[in-house]
Design a protein with these regions (language model features):
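Aliphatic-rich helix starts adjacent to a transmembrane/signal segment
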Residues: 1-39
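Surface-exposed beta-strand edges and their flanking turn/coil or helix-capping segments
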Residues: 36, 44-47, 88, 129
Length: 194
């Protein structure tokens, strides 16, 4: 009985350390993925907030009051595409030809996992083309890693912060000099809740 009493706490401590190591490795890999994606940004960068209300899944496209922080990041790779990175709720997505990229059932399972949406840019003014005939469209969607790669973990918090400056007489156009990404990886409880 004494041996079991000593081994059980040691085994639990070992599992806890192993889980923390996995969480740190996952967080490092996710940060590197974000860094690699943003590396090609050569147009605008927009800080926004991911959708958290299932009744308004397109709120990520709403105008924001802050130019320097958010839970989602949209940036352009001129002249090819616009990319949106977040970990929050995503609507069902279709491409411009009406083909499903992501069903609503698939989208609901991906809340808490890093995902990237890619949109075409309009040819006239290089603004993001998020809609066609009133429907949100994307030309590609991917997750950084399959859900199984998270090993029972998920992203509980993702936040982007920028250090920036504004030119004299410039209107609402800050110049980003550095960006910080804060990511928290957590474990869901036994019921699968956050």
């Amino acid at each position: 009985l004494a041996a079991v009493t000593l081994i059980r706490p040691s085994a639990q401590a070992y599992r806890d350390i192993q889980q923390q190591t996995r969480a740190q490795n996952l967080a490092d890999a996710l940060i590197e993925t974000i860094r690699g994606e943003v590396l090609d940004a050569n147009g605008y960068i927009r800080f926004t907030n991911g959708a958290t209300d299932s009744a308004n899944l397109d709120s990520v496209f709403d105008a924001q009051t802050s130019y320097s922080d958010g839970t989602a990041l949209e940036f352009s790779v001129y002249p090819n595409h616009v990319e949106l990175i977040d970990k929050d709720l995503v609507p069902a997505l279709k491409n411009s030809k009406g083909k499903d990229l992501l069903t609503q059932a698939q989208a609901e399972e991906l809340n808490g996992y890093l995902h990237m949406r890619f949109y075409q840019q309009e040819q006239r003014d290089f603004a993001p083309l998020h809609e066609k005939d009133g429907e949100k469209i994307a030309y590609a969607y991917t997750t950084a890693y399959p859900k199984e790669s998270y090993m029972g973990l998920y992203i509980s918090d993702l936040h982007f912060y920028a250090r920036s400056w504004a030119q004299e007489n410039d209107t609402d156009t800050p110049r980003i000099t550095a960006m910080t990404v804060v990511i928290t990886v957590a474990k869901r409880d036994s019921s699968g809740n956050d």
